Design a protein with these regions (language model features):
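Extended, low-polarity transmembrane helix blocks
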Residues: 1-92, 99-174
């Protein structure tokens, strides 16, 4: 059984901040799903909404990678199935993090997704804002921190989730 958050991070204020950080990153994923699905006028307008025939992953893979070293690889991934995989990933990661459940699985999925996004935009190419660190890398590091500190236990349902029979038998679901 994993250790409770109170034994991993003993400072209650620090646990609250970790819980808030988990909620914030979870909302980044969840909001991205909602905006791309319904075209809420933030990063996605209604005409490009997924429900209106928009292709969120395909658009990213063919647009953000233009002129980048790995463009041909990422453009080859721009298929309709990738839209479903991307959107379900955003939804699943977002819901898991907001609720504080399945944080291990959400962290692994999120780090993989963000790793692909990091490589797609190739920040090391001349002209980017920072050749090493961008938001994808920062979010990935936060995702790694969340299950390591049992951040789902504070301001979330992590403690309850870890006690479920199926989760105790399949610890990757923690």
């Amino acid at each position: 059984m994993p250790r409770p958050a109170s034994t991993v991070v003993t400072s209650k204020p620090a646990r609250v901040v970790l819980g808030l950080l988990r909620l914030a990153v979870g909302f980044v994923f969840l909001w991205s799903f909602l905006d791309k699905t319904f075209g809420l006028h933030y990063s996605t307008g209604p005409s490009r909404a997924w429900i209106n025939g928009g292709t969120p992953a395909q658009s990213y893979l063919t647009g953000a990678t233009t002129g980048k070293p790995l463009a041909s690889f990422f453009e080859s991934l721009a298929v309709p199935a990738m839209d479903w995989l991307f959107m379900m990933g955003l939804l699943g990661i977002g819901v898991a993090l907001v609720l504080g459940i399945g944080t291990r699985l959400a962290a692994v999925a999120g780090v993989v997704m963000l790793g692909f996004m990091y490589a797609a935009v190739a920040p090391w190419v001349w002209g980017s804002l920072n050749p090493v660190v961008n938001e994808h890398l920062v979010y990935a590091l936060v995702l790694i921190l969340i299950p390591l500190t049992s951040a789902g236990d504070t301001l979330g349902l992590g403690s309850w989730w870890k006690g479920l029979g199926l989760v105790t038998k399949l610890p990757f679901l923690i």
